[in-house]
């Protein structure tokens, strides 16, 4: 069982070549262009087996649909989602200077160190589900080069203040997407069959709310929530900040919108969704920020939607709207609003149970039980 990245805890953070000037492991365009369709034959075989198991048809409810969905995603009538990989992307946001969060921007770097020490909620949940956890610094204001075990794949030191400037340049948003692609490729190379995406970045609910409004046409009032727990006065201020960001314009494409309003870790999660879908790897989506990142990925490649499973419904105001935009039905609703991939990690055992049920339950014929489907 491991809750730390693969780097040795006694060595400094591992540093990848700059994504702006090095050969890419996989180019963004190749991942967008090679997302496969769902395997309908694998779904058919899984569904037929589900109906032959020693239970009334459909009696395991959404677990049965989940099992069939995972078969279609993976192309295997008896799918597996173990081992899981949890990837937490961390970056700072210039919009934190607008006082939109209950916590100072310095908390991003402090939480990255906490992840590396194994002390955060996601570390606990990763240990519980025996998942590999990797923390990637894609743009923390203070580089994590002295934090053992953190992967450095930095694009820049924090995003721009979206209230008055773009978050990133077009090249930087592409580089951040490719950070996510590389992270998923590392996870798959290590054997991961399911990817859970998490994030850390003070003020990232502000950027996510702006992105959601831009993608859906909703107003700031409709998408903005309390994030880390802000009071009414700061909530009203946060809405005004997002309205200012939206007034600058959002561009014509999903890449333009990410560059204008997004965040480095949000773009990295979107890239991770692209890479996972390209490799037939299910993505267990976490809360509000992760769902907005997933929405961004589907605006670049609609086929990504087929590979998304929604772990939970967050308590953040805009999450319901983000789920609605994706037609997502979350597995859990626990009033969570932490991020880090925590809610998705809590939902992961449901995916594992769906797979185990499909492969390990006896059929009516095997068990000698009457009442099964006719031959």
Predicted regions span which residues?
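N-terminal loops that bind phosphate or other acidic moieties
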Residues: 2-5, 12, 16, 20-375
């Amino acid at each position: 069982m491991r809750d730390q990245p693969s780097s040795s805890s006694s060595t400094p953070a591992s540093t990848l070549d700059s994504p702006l000037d090095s050969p890419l492991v996989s180019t963004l365009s190749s991942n967008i262009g090679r997302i496969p369709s769902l395997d309908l034959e694998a779904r058919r075989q899984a569904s037929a087996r589900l109906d032959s198991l020693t239970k009334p048809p459909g009696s395991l409810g959404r677990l049965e649909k989940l099992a069939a969905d995972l078969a279609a995603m993976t192309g295997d009538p008896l799918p597996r989602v173990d081992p899981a990989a949890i990837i937490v992307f961390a970056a700072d946001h210039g919009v934190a200077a607008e006082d939109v969060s209950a916590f100072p921007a310095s908390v991003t770097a402090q939480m990255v160190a906490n992840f590396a020490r194994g002390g955060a909620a996601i570390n606990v949940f990763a240990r519980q589900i025996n998942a590999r956890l990797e923390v990637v610094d894609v743009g923390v204001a203070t580089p994590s080069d002295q934090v053992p075990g953190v992967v450095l794949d930095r694009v820049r030191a924090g995003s721009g203040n979206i209230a008055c400037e773009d978050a990133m340049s077009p090249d930087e948003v592409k580089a951040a997407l490719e950070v996510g692609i590389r992270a998923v490729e590392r996870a798959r190379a290590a054997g991961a069959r399911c990817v859970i995406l998490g994030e850390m970045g003070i003020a990232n609910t502000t950027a996510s709310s702006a992105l959601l409004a831009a993608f859906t046409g909703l107003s700031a009032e409709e998408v903005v929530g309390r994030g880390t727990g802000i009071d009414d006065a700061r909530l009203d201020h946060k809405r005004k900040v997002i309205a200012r960001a939206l007034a600058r314009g959002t561009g014509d494409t999903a890449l333009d919108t990410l560059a204008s309003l997004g965040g480095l870790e949000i773009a990295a999660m979107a890239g991770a969704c692209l890479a996972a879908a390209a490799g037939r790897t299910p993505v267990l989506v976490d809360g509000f920020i992760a769902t907005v990142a997933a929405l961004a990925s589907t605006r670049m490649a609609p086929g990504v939607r087929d590979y998304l499973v929604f772990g939970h419904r967050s308590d953040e105001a805009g999450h319901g709207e983000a789920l609605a935009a994706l037609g997502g039905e979350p597995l859990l609703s626990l009033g969570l609003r932490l991020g880090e991939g925590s809610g998705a990690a809590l939902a992961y055992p449901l995916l594992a149970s769906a797979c185990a049920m499909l492969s390990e339950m006896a059929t009516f014929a095997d068990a000698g039980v009457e009442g099964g489907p006719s031959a």
